[in-house]
Amino acid sequence: NSTSRQLVDAMRNTYMPYLRDVEFEGEKVDPPTQIEWYPEDLAWHFDVRKNVLRKSPEFKRLHQFLVYETEVGSISRQEAVSMLPPLLLDVRPEHLVLDMCAAPGSKTAQLIEALHSPLTSEPDAFNPLPRGFIVANDSDTKRAHMLVHQAQRLPSPNLIVTNVDASCMPNALVPWANADGTVHQRELK
């Protein structure tokens, strides 16, 4: 969407030019790099110590940008390996997703974004709410609370947060249609 493109452009054009040759306390600091396998250039990686983020003028400016965009729900921070399951699921607006161990919520945020992805790439096209939804569960009360807090950044009427032992969830048989339109059953556990 246009917000995502604006954030990528901001990283490339507003912040990256100033982060390429940064030195802090006599050491070169590596700039952020794009994660090549993530679609649409939307994921970045950087490994910068906290004192560099807070004290280097160049990185402090980036840090303020990242904190603000995280607070308003435009970006999420997570390990690259945690980005894989939602990508591999290839969630569409009509899908029903059950995440049994969802906290702290970064993968859930990624799933919500996928669920709400536009049905058309036309910028002015009407995109209704998705028909699908996500049930995000965590059995630990404190972690479930953290999940609710994270979910508030991405308000979606298509999200249900639960706090139960995942082994108590019922087995579900869900019909799935394949590319030729036939339906078969997969047991979800």
Predicted regions and their residues:
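S-adenosylmethionine
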Residues: 1-189
